[in-house]
Structure formats: C-alpha cells, structure tokens
Amino acid sequence: MSESPYTSGTTHFGFRDVAAKDKQKLVGEVFTSVARNYDLMNDLMSLGIHRAWKRYFVATAQVKPGDRVLDLAGGTGDIAVLLKERVGNEGAVVLGDINAGMLSVGRDRLTNRGLVAGFDYVQCNAEALPFPDQSFDLVTISFGLRNVTDKDAALREMYRVLKVGGQARVLEFSEVTADWFKPIYDFHSFKILPKLGQLFARDADSYQYLAESIRKHPPQDSLKGMMGEAGFARCHYKNLTGGIVAIHSGYKI
C-alpha cells in the first residue's frame, strides 16, 4: 500500500519536500494565482490538446441521462458542461473544488453562458467529501489528483460517495511512454512552459510547480494499484498522446 503523507509527515510540492500540513495551502496559492488564466494554463501545458482529451474523457464515461455526477477539482467548469450534456435535463452535475477562486470562475462562466439548471457548486476537499455514501452515479477528477496531498484518502472518498455499479474516472498528466519523446517533453515542461507562464500570465513559479507536479504524480500502473487498494474493481487505464495523459477507470461493485 502506498504510504500516506500524513504518516510520513512530509510530502512533495513539485520537487520540494514540504510538511504535509502545508501542501494544501501552497497548492491553493498556485491555483488562486492561475484561476483567471486556467484555460490558458492548460493550453500552454498541453499545446491545446487538453480540449480533445476532455471531450474523449467524458464521451467514454459510463453515464446516462438522469444520472447524478460529481466532478472534483472542477475548475472552470469545462468538464461539468460536457457531463451535463450527457446526463440531460433530468440529471445533475455537482462541481466540487477546494479552491474558492477556481469555483467562482467556474460558476461565473457557466452562469454567463446561461447554464444554471442542473448545476451545483460545492467548495470541498477531495480527501473528506461532504456527501453521504452512495450519492453519485459517476465521480470524475481531471488534472486535479496530482495536486491532492493524500491521494489514497481522495480515492477512498471517491469510492465511498459512488453508488454501487457506478464508475470513477481520473484524467491526469502521466508518464510518457516513448523514450524518444521524453527529452522533448522535458524541454517543453521545464524550459519553455515557465517562460510562457511568465510571458502570458506573469507567473513563472506557478507554471514551474505544475510541470514538477506532473513528474511527481504516480505513473500509470501505480495509480491503477492505488485505485484497487481504495476498493475499486475492474481498474484499468488508457494512455492518450503517448502517455502524456492517462484515463484511469474503476467501478464500485
């Protein structure tokens, strides 16, 4: 079983070792800083491909009209909008995020587009969700799990609030599978991305952290094992774009 950072007392914040109790605050500062430029951040990190990844992530999810869905680390609401299209007028999407700034941006964007009915917004910590057991037919988290301090706790909470028969899905930057591409990817991540962050968002440090956080995230097989330890069955993953990102899925049976 992977070690909880609360057991060891320290965890990583990018490539830095920090006290586990401090990581949530540090991550919060990063996302408060980038909230208004979050879509730009994803465009810079993925060269714009994140939009296709997200569409595929939702299109292949186990969800049907009338379902109730929780989207964690919901950010600016782009995944929530796609999920609402899947669940229809009879369904509901709860957009959860620990960061009030991100949640506010998401709420404002959806409201300005006239997307009000069927959406709820909850500021919540993925490690201790404020929902009863078996509340949702589908639980998703995209580009958020790597920023959680205690990932094992978050996966257990996703399992707890999922209904029997439901699916949990994780979309996250992962480990590149092609050896020839790794130097190119590293160069973009550590040399180009922070400079782009400084140029377009006046915030090189946050973009440096985000690049580092990807390298510290568990690789594909490790995360699959963590999902199994959290209780999920039929765990599997699919690499996209050569492993730059991966979609992990598990079921509550």
Curated annotation (Swiss-Prot):
UniProt-listed Pfam families: Ubie_methyltran
Gene3D superfamilies per record: Vaccinia Virus protein VP39
Protein family membership: Belongs to the class I-like SAM-binding methyltransferase superfamily. MenG/UbiE family.
Reactions the enzyme catalyzes: a 2-demethylmenaquinol + S-adenosyl-L-methionine = a menaquinol + S-adenosyl-L-homocysteine + H(+); a 2-methoxy-6-(all-trans-polyprenyl)benzene-1,4-diol + S-adenosyl-L-methionine = a 5-methoxy-2-methyl-3-(all-trans-polyprenyl)benzene-1,4-diol + S-adenosyl-L-homocysteine + H(+)
EC annotation from Swiss-Prot or TrEMBL: 2.1.1.163, 2.1.1.201
Name of the protein in question: Ubiquinone/menaquinone biosynthesis C-methyltransferase UbiE
Species the sequence originates in: Xanthomonas campestris pv. campestris (strain ATCC 33913 / DSM 3586 / NCPPB 528 / LMG 568 / P 25)
Top-level enzyme category: transferase
Pathway in which the depicted protein is active: Quinol/quinone metabolism; menaquinone biosynthesis; menaquinol from 1,4-dihydroxy-2-naphthoate: step 2/2; Cofactor biosynthesis; ubiquinone biosynthesis
Alphabetical list of SUPFAM superfamilies matching this protein: S-adenosyl-L-methionine-dependent methyltransferases
Keywords: Menaquinone biosynthesis, Methyltransferase, S-adenosyl-L-methionine, Transferase, Ubiquinone biosynthesis
Superkingdom field: Bacteria
Binding site for S-adenosyl-L-methionine: T76, D97, N125, A126, S142
